[in-house]
From Swiss-Prot:
Phylogenetic lineage: Bacteria, Thermotogati, Thermotogota, Thermotogae, Thermotogales
Any one GO molecular function term: aminoacyl-tRNA deacylase activity
Domain notes: Consists of three domains; the N-terminal catalytic domain, the editing domain and the C-terminal C-Ala domain. The editing domain removes incorrectly charged amino acids, while the C-Ala domain, along with tRNA(Ala), serves as a bridge to cooperatively bring together the editing and aminoacylation centers thus stimulating deacylation of misacylated tRNAs.
PROSITE patterns: AA_TRNA_LIGASE_II_ALA
Source organism per UniProt: Pseudothermotoga lettingae (strain ATCC BAA-301 / DSM 14385 / NBRC 107922 / TMO)
Family to which the UniProt record says this protein belongs: Belongs to the class-II aminoacyl-tRNA synthetase family.
Gene it is expressed from: alaS
Protein name as annotated: Alanine--tRNA ligase
Pfam families attached to this UniProt entry: DHHA1, tRNA-synt_2c, tRNA_SAD
């Protein structure tokens, strides 16, 4: 049975048991507590919590999942993976333990035809009900039902809070010989021999942030069986990587990198890492994640670069992973159409990140080799930080390389140095106050909703339904509002609230849970209470400016796709009253002609004064008509579509102008890279464009005045000044060089026996200048040793020269290595030429004295 056949058999089996087959959800969960979908139940958490009523009470899925908590084990064990597929069947208040257990046994014994005598069961030690079902109804021998503790047989939650419950696992006896200290081998004492193939979770509790358990409104079933793991049992192979799921990928790796699997265990580790990581990279990019230095993007970058690093260990000298990804897409694209639909994007982003990392490797490897050469047992955290800060060299790769040299890495020291950079938005995810606030709004959403009327009006009458003090401000919820909440990259409205005897300013608006709109307000006068009737007034000018920029963002997106190609996808955006910022997937900088074409195209649509149409329709209908849906966004059955004739059509809940002519004028002010494969354009519209052009015009006028020229002559004037400056710089450099040579020649040398010893200290000169001076120091001389230093406040560089007649007995490289120790740095080189560097210029005399004694001994 192939992996594809196994997947299909599982889904069809449960379909016959009354389950609805649902497609896999995205790897990007709609859950603020999780970076990725880590289990099959994640998409159903709101149902398990009792917050959302299920459309179907019985569901079965094959869910794509990603976990990186054990990434260092991937490739080193037969089972560990980052990306995997989770087979699962779910019941939402329908059947419970009895049916789940009976059906699981039926599937593994009758469909998969696994030998019953090889199957063992574990149950939670306090779950007597499950024990009896396995023993009395299914008929499993009592000695093969093992009671286990909470650490192994109580599942969840998937995050700090959430649904959880006892679980029962099916284990397969692989028959491997293993000494078990407790007597007979069982799943309780033998991880290697017994392979867990299916976990049946009986979800009946909710765990809060303190760890307290509360019964859920309904009892649920959540089961999970790793497709790759089950396939290894069915196909009777020792490793997930030997199944037909991985074979085409490993075969491609062999072809591309010229290696052979199962010939060398160290190489096999790297092959397995690449095979696993290529799947993770392909699916992450397909689901809208792009390499970056934070959150999901950082995880993708880490996985991708780890795969490349293992490719380098196998001899790769140029980008190769995108070629492996092609096989992933070909092999899995029929099951997961997003791979084929986004093939070009996956390959382009992968290749661009590979190219960037190969540059990083070549720069960082030299520094890493130097670090390893002077590290006896531990690589210092400061060195790891320098590698990351200077070259973007990932710390996990330093750890991998360190293992090859039996070195440890001071990751704790690295983390301390990284603290400032790492204090990002993720801290909010684990914030207890944030979790408490979420619970409050979850409860409020069960009783009340905020109706948004802001598409049609900027002012409305409303009633306060919830009020909470938050520092010096308040969080206020109304039964309806005209204020747009921050969402989809658009900032929230601001404005005023007035009521009888009072007023407040609205500073920010957000949506903590669906249906609740929270206003951050500053009470300026009077007292506001729950139940108070108020009037909400949106700042008209800021709303209109934001609307101009939002519609312009849609036009920019469409123009980018028309000029650059349909591989362009939105990777992020920010829409404010002042400007718009649009991040998109593209592998190289835009040319001046491309930018001009895009800008002209957008302005042409603006000048044509085309109506901007907004309408609601079904999601399927909108997508079928060609409307662009953004990766990672969650859409309901009914969506809002914003359309500009045949030029642009997107699913969007933001605010827009009624007519493109209302935008006025569109101007791109910058284009840059924010990460490999992702570009950013910033632009302005309306009066902001006019003000921008006025400032530019005034700046040009001021420059002309300073240079005493006209706008027509300004370019030639500047070119003349640049040429003069270059000539003056050359003259100045020549003068400086003469001074340095003069300083060197005027420095008296020491005669030690028959050896001419030259040593001279210069103040903060370039390394190439120091090298030139060292050439002069030994030019036309024999029996000469020269030490030339360049110092700055906390840095010293040294060049050591030894003439050829002395180089066999006095080696420049040895002097440099010793000098590096004294100067607290690193160094080395050839017998006739060597360099060293350090951070303690005060030790220069010690280096000179050491060399003097060395010469006296020869």
């Amino acid at each position: 049975m192939t992996g594809d056949e196994l997947r299909s058999a599982f889904l069809r089996f449960f379909e016959k048991k009354g389950h609805k087959i649902l497609p896999s959800a995205s790897l990007i969960p709609d859950d603020p507590q999780l970076l990725f979908t880590v289990a099959g139940m994640v998409p159903f958490k709101p149902i398990f919590w009792g917050k959302v009523e299920p459309v179907y009470t019985r569901v079965t899925t094959c869910q794509k999942c990603l976990r990186t908590n054990d990434i260092e084990n991937v490739g080193r064990t037969p089972r560990h993976q980052t990306f995997f597929e989770m087979l699962g069947n779910f019941s939402f208040g329908d059947y419970f333990k009895k049916e789940a257990i009976i059906w699981a046994w039926e599937f593994v014994t009758e469909v998969l035809k696994l030998e019953k005598d090889r199957l063992w069961i574990t149950v939670y030690e306090e779950d007597e009900e499950s024990f009896k079902i396995w023993k009395d109804i299914v008929g499993v021998c009592e000695k093969k039902i093992i009671r286990m503790g909470k650490d192994t047989n109580f599942w969840g939650p998937a995050g700090p809070t959430g649904p959880c419950g006892p679980c029962s696992e099916i284990h397969y006896d692989t028959g491997l010989n293993e000494d078990c200290s407790d007597g007979e081998c069982t799943p309780a004492n033998s991880d290697k021999r017994f392979l867990e193939i299916w976990n049946l979770v009986f979800t009946e509790f909710y765990q809060d942030e303190k760890g307290a358990l509360y019964p859920l409104p309904r009892k649920n079933i959540d089961t999970g069986a790793g497709l790759e793991r089950v396939a290894s049992v069915v196909q009777k192979v020792e490793s997930n990587f030997e199944t037909d799921i991985f074979k085409p990928i490993i075969s491609k790796i062999e072809d591309v990198l010229g290696v052979e699997y199962k010939k060398d265990e160290q190489k096999d580790i790297s092959i397995r890492v690449i095979a696993d990581h290529s799947r993770a990279v392909s699916f992450l990019i397909a689901d809208g994640v792009f390499p970056s230095n934070e959150e999901r993007g950082y995880v993708l970058r880490r996985i991708l670069r780890r795969a490349v690093r293992h490719g380098v260990l196998l001899g790769a000298q140029k980008p190769f992973l995108h070629l492996i990804n092609e096989t992933v897409i070909e092999h899995m694209g029929n099951t997961y159409s997003e791979l084929k639909n986004r093939k070009d994007l996956i390959l382009e982003v992968t290749r661009a990140e590979e190219e960037r990392f190969f540059k990083t490797i070549s720069q960082g490897n030299e520094m890493l080799r130097d670090i390893i050469s002077r590290s006896s047992k531990v690589i210092d955290g400061e060195d790891v930080f320098k590698l990351y800060d200077t070259y973007g060299f990932p710390p996990d790769i330093v750890v991998d390389v360190a293992k090859d040299y039996n070195l440890k890495v001071d990751l704790e020291g690295f983390e301390k140095l990284m603290k400032i950079q790492r204090e990002r938005a993720r801290s909010a995810r684990n914030n207890v106050e944030y979790a408490k606030s979420q619970e409050i709004y979850d409860e409020l959403a069960q009783k009340s909703k905020t109706v948004f009327v802001g598409y049609d009006t900027l002012e409305c009458e409303a009633k306060v339904i919830f009020l909470k003090k938050s520092g010096t401000k308040y969080e206020a919820v109304f039964d309806k509002t005209s204020f747009y909440a921050e969402r989809g990259g658009q900032v929230s409205d601001v404005g005023q609230i007035v009521w009888d005897g009072g007023s407040a300013s609205v500073e920010h608006v957000f949506i903590p849970v669906e249906g609740i709109i929270v206003h951050i307000i500053n009470v300026e006068k009077g007292e506001l209470k729950e139940g108070t009737k108020v009037r909400l007034i949106v700042d008209r000018e800021k709303r209109l400016s934001t609307a101009r920029n939002h519609t312009a963002t849609h036009l920019l997106h469409a123009a980018l796709r028309k000029v650059l190609g349909t591989h362009v996808k939105q990777a992020g955006s920010l829409v404010t009253p002042e400007k718009l910022r649009f991040d998109f997937t593209h592998h190289k900088p835009l040319t001046d002609n491309e930018l001009m074409s895009i800008e002209n195209m957008v302005n042409e649509i603006i000048l044509r004064s085309i109506p901007v149409i907004t309408e609601e329709k079904s999601y399927k209908e909108a997508v079928a008509e060609g409307a662009i849906a953004l990766f990672g966004e969650k859409y309901g059955d009914v969506v809002r579509v914003v359309k500009v004739h045949s030029f642009s059509e997107e699913l969007c809940g933001g605010t827009h102008v009624k007519n493109t002519g209302n935008i006025g004028l569109f101007r791109i002010v910058s284009e840059s890279a924010i990460s490999s494969g992702t570009r950013r354009i910033e632009a302005i519209t309306g009066f902001n464009t006019l003000n921008y052009l006025r400032v530019k015009e005034q700046l040009v006028g001021n420059i002309c005045e300073k240079l005493g020229t006209s706008q027509d002559e300004i370019l030639s004037k500047i070119e003349n000044l640049i040429e003069k400056n270059i000539n003056l710089q050359k003259e100045l450099q020549q003068f400086k060089s003469k001074l340095l040579v003069s300083q060197l020649k005027q420095t008296p040398f020491e005669q030690i026996k028959n050896i001419r010893f030259v040593h001279c200290v210069f103040n903060d000169i370039e390394s190439n200048e120091l090298r030139n001076l060292s050439d002069i120091a030994v030019a036309g001389e024999n029996s000469t040793v020269a030490l030339l230093f360049s110092t700055s406040k906390d840095k010293v560089n040294l060049i050591v020269r030894v003439t050829q007649d002395l180089a066999k007995k006095i080696k420049a490289g040895d002097i440099a290595k010793y000098a590096a120790q004294i100067l607290e740095g690193g160094g080395g080189g050839r017998p006739d030429f060597a360099q060293a560097g350090g951070k303690d210029p005060s030790k220069i005399n010690s280096v000179i004295e050491y060399t003097r004694k060395l010469l006296e001994q020869n």
